[in-house]
Every structure is written in structure tokens, then in C-alpha cells.
Amino acid sequence: EPYRRQRQMCIRDRFKFVSDFGVSFSVAFEEDELLQSGESYQFALTNYEGIKSPRDPKVRDTVMCIVDEFFRKNQAALLYICETGDGMQKMRSRLFSFWFSVYAEHDNFLFLPQIVYDEEENENYAALIIRRDNPRFNDLVSEFTNTITLLNGKPD
């Protein structure tokens, strides 16, 4: 069974839970303006004390339960952008892709990972997660892929 989670009352759509290993996590959904063709939120998973977390399937199950609940309440797209401060973004991207691949409902979703290069040619990992039955599916997916292409375009 996943971890018991608490919704923070002061902040809409932010959840906190503590693993059996004493690691504190928060999951947040914040409205995002990147995609204009439909409602979108940025998804954030934070280990806010920075304690190293061992592999823990209950963390995955808890996070995916929270994501599932989000999609049951919202006809929105989720943007997942990996934290880059410590150089572990590629590992985070792979881990989240794996979590999503074993998620029971994954066939109902498009999970579209992309790499965005910054000015220093560093790889930044992002993904669009959207229900296949979202009424704005085609518009949001094409806007996301066009935005990634634009961000990766080389200035002349």
C-alpha cells in the first residue's frame, strides 16, 4: 500500500509524504503558461530535505496514485521537467519514465519525453503527460512538440 499523504491546506494541489526510510517528499501541480491550447500544469516531485532515498516502490506507487488523482479531477496536460541543479536530470528522467511504464493505467496516456538543450548545450529533460481522451489532445501534443523544436532551434 502506498504511503499516507497529506494535502497542504495552504497550497492547492501540493501533497507531502514521508517514506519508511524517513525521506520527506512533496508532489505539486502548478498551473503553467507554456501551452496555450489547453490547460496545463507543471508537475514537481521534491525530496525537500535532500536525503538520499534508496529504491522504494512505495514512493513510486504513492506518486503515481497522486498523478492518477490529478488526472481524474482535471482535463489538463502535465509537464514534467527534471531538476538540473545536481546533474542527475538524466537519471531522474529515466526513473520517472520507468515509473510511468509500470503504472497500471499507462495505456490511457501519452508519455512524451523530450530533451531540451540550453545555451551551454546541457541536456534538460522534459515530458508531456496527457490522457489520450483529452478533448484538446492533438492541439496540446502538437504545441508541445513545436515548442520543444523552437527551444532547440539554433539562432542564426
Residue ranges and their predicted role:
Residues 13, 18-52:
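Conserved donor-binding loop and adjoining core beta-sheet/short helix segment
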Residues 10, 92-100, 124-135:
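Short, charged low-complexity intrinsically disordered segments located at boundaries
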Residues 107-156:
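Acidic, proline/glycine-rich low-complexity IDRs
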Residues 30-32, 39-42, 93-94, 140-145, ...:
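Surface-exposed beta-strand edges and their flanking turn/coil or helix-capping segments
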